[in-house]
Design a protein with these regions (language model features):
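Outer-membrane pore/translocation modules
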Residues: 127-241
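Repeated loop/turn-to-beta-strand initiation elements of outer-membrane beta-barrel proteins
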Residues: 58, 119-124, 166-169, 221-225, ...
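Extracytoplasmic loops and strand-loop junctions of Gram-negative outer membrane beta-barrel proteins
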Residues: 43-45, 88-96, 139-143, 193-199, ...
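Surface-exposed loop and membrane-interface regions of Gram-negative outer-membrane beta-barrel proteins
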Residues: 83-105, 116-156
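Residues on the lipid-exposed face of transmembrane beta-strands in outer-membrane beta-barrel proteins
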Residues: 50, 62, 110-114, 124, ...
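Outer membrane beta-barrel transmembrane domains
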Residues: 73-95, 236-293
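Short sequence motifs at beta-strands and strand-loop junctions characteristic
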Residues: 96-106, 148-153, 201-208, 242-244, ...
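Outer-membrane beta-barrel biogenesis signature
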Residues: 25-88, 167, 178-182, 198
């Protein structure tokens, strides 16, 4: 069963560029706020000039992302909230006593880059994340409720190397666990604030390693390909680890005229399941994972 998303992404540059994307289910805030290493290499919204008309090696990048998830799918079939909300379904996964209805994610991603030479470039990226999730519930006193979290996410340090006249680009990085995994909110599990689900935490809590290999030819028509992965290590202080992420994408662009360009692209992404569990999210007798996790 998947939540249906409505996703909008905007990249700010000297000019403003808007793009739309589609995904099948909500990602965790730390996954949502990740910026493509190729985007970091290519983007520059602030590029100071030094003497002799040469560009400064320093760049300052900003990216704004927002996503909204609403509704449920069972395969390709749309489900109403009444179809999903109900007594625990004894493991069948069809009904839940607590149901997220609308999930809104926003990320402001700030990146500082330095061009060492024609082949090497380094970046430091820090996101600020906000998330709000509306719920319906069968629990008395919690027929409707909202959980909100916001703060700094996981910082990423990365290096990019141009392999062949910038046609091939290899990028490696390390994601630092600077985002909180201890966010709390008022949930039906009990009075007061409790630990909120994995999908509301701002960071992964582990040291992770993003890697990306991309290709882009400089001649027309233009073809670009990208393969990337985020490899996660160990377990965090809450005894779990987010799953590894893998993605493949390609884009074919052609100049239809001097002012008109067209392109077609295809992308796929796969995420492993979460390893381990945060026992503070367990509720009920026998104890089961909090449904909104």
């Amino acid at each position: 069963m998947k939540i249906k998303p409505v996703v909008i992404a905007a990249n700010s540059s000297l000019l403003c560029f808007f793009s739309t994307s589609y995904c099948l289910a909500q990602s965790t805030p730390s996954e949502f706020a990740q910026m493509s290493l190729q985007e970091l290499f290519n983007q520059s919204i602030y590029d100071t000039e030094i003497q002799q008309g040469q560009a400064s090696p320093w760049t300052l990048n900003y990216q704004y992302k927002t996503a909204k998830f609403e509704g449920y799918l069972d395969g390709t079939k749309s489900l109403s909230f009444n179809d999903v909300k109900g007594p625990p379904s004894n493991g069948s996964g069809k009904t839940f006593p607590v149901v997220p209805t609308t999930i809104t994610q926003t990320a402001h991603i700030y990146s500082l880059g330095y061009q060492f030479n024609d082949q090497w470039q380094g970046h430091l990226s820090v996101p600020y994340i906000k998330q709000s999730t509306d719920h319906l519930s069968l629990v008395p006193g919690y027929s409707t409720f909202t959980i909100k979290t916001d703060g700094i996410g996981d910082a990423v340090m990365s290096a990019s190397y141009a392999l062949n006249s910038e046609s091939w680009l290899l990028s490696l990085g390390i994601s630092l666990p600077t985002g909180s995994i201890d966010e709390k909110g008022d949930t039906p599990r009990g009075p007061g604030n409790q630990q909120v689900p994995y999908t509301m935490q701002l960071g992964s809590g582990t040291y992770d390693f993003p890697v990306e290999l991309s290709y882009q030819n400089s001649s027309a028509p233009n073809l670009s390909l990208k393969a990337s992965a985020t490899i996660r290590t160990g377990t965090n202080d809450r005894d779990y680890r987010l799953g590894n992420n893998y993605s493949l994408s390609g884009r074919y662009k052609v100049d239809l005229s001097s002012r008109l360009k067209g392109y077609v692209g295809l992308a796929g992404q796969y995420s492993d399941s979460i390893h381990g569990q945060d026992d503070s999210l367990l509720a009920g007798d026998p104890a089961t994972l909090y449904p909104a996790s």
